[in-house]
Amino acid sequence: DIIKTVMELRARGVEFLSPPPHAYYEDIPKRLGKHMSMMKEDLNVIEKLAIMVDADEDGYLLQIFTKPVEDRPTLFFEIIQRMGAKGFGAGNFKALFESIEREQAKRGTL
């Protein structure tokens, strides 16, 4: 359960990459297409927790990435929950890249 996991990790001090913009979450129904009817998770909660959503022909997935865990921004963890999807969230690549860039800008390492 990615929602409970992310909430617990945040409570324990784990920091995640900054969330995609609100427009990202507005586009989720379009990205999920036929899989939107399968989605049980509340989109408001997904957005509040900054969890990203993607789909492939087999289903959808939920994923989030921690901030880098070392001084060099090269190691981070991914939390992923697959709901039939077999891919790796390729549709989230741009959102992930932009989030990493925002974090680097905050750190002054862009």
Task: Enumerate the language-model features and the residues they cover.
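Glyoxalase I/VOC metalloenzyme domain signal
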Residues: 1-110
